């Protein structure tokens, strides 16, 4: 597989944005399979970035020889949401990134049945949020997903300040009740 590191100016985020892409080797994929290539979005966990899956897993080795495009975007600690502090990661992922990638990779599928999403921890939260709120993904997988905030207390988790959590999700009383 080819490992591509892409940085482009995101109109939604109003900044340069980093995305890693694993792309099938042309010599390992039949010509007929080079059209409408399935795509998997892999979302990193908290404190990770678009390099996490490549550095901490065998994803590249395991997918070698397959006909699958793997997209690994960076959202810092933005929880794959449109944050209160101005970074609209949800909108960037749900709307902008697939269109940008389609321009880079015209043979990448646009079909829901061939588009998948998975994530680790914070990325598990993001993948279910994106899969349930859009009609883009046919399958979603959450690995140790941060899916329940009912008993969550930022103070007890040592995971950022209350101001950080308000910046991502708004007032704590509102998002723990949702």
What is the predicted function of each stretch?
Residues 1-178:
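Non-catalytic cap/lid and distal C-terminal segments of serine-dependent acyl enzymes
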């Amino acid at each position: 597989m080819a490992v591509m590191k892409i940085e482009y100016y995101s109109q939604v985020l109003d900044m340069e944005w980093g995305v890693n892409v694993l792309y099938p080797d042309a010599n390992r994929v039949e010509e007929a399979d080079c059209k409408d290539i399935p795509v998997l979005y892999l979302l990193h966990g908290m404190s990770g970035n678009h390099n996490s899956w490549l550095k901490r897993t065998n994803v590249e080795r395991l997918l070698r020889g397959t006909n699958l495009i793997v997209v690994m975007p960076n959202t810092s600690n933005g929880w794959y949401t449109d944050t209160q502090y101005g970074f609209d990661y949800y909108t960037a992922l749900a709307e902008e990134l697939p269109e940008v990638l389609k321009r880079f990779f015209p043979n990448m599928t646009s079909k829901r049945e061939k588009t998948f999403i998975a994530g680790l921890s914070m990325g598990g939260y993001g993948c279910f949020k994106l899969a349930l709120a859009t009609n883009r993904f046919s399958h979603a997988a959450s690995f140790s997903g941060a899916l329940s905030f009912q008993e969550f207390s930022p103070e007890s988790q040592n995971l950022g300040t209350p101001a950080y959590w308000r910046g991502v999700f708004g007032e704590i009383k509102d998002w723990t009740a949702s």
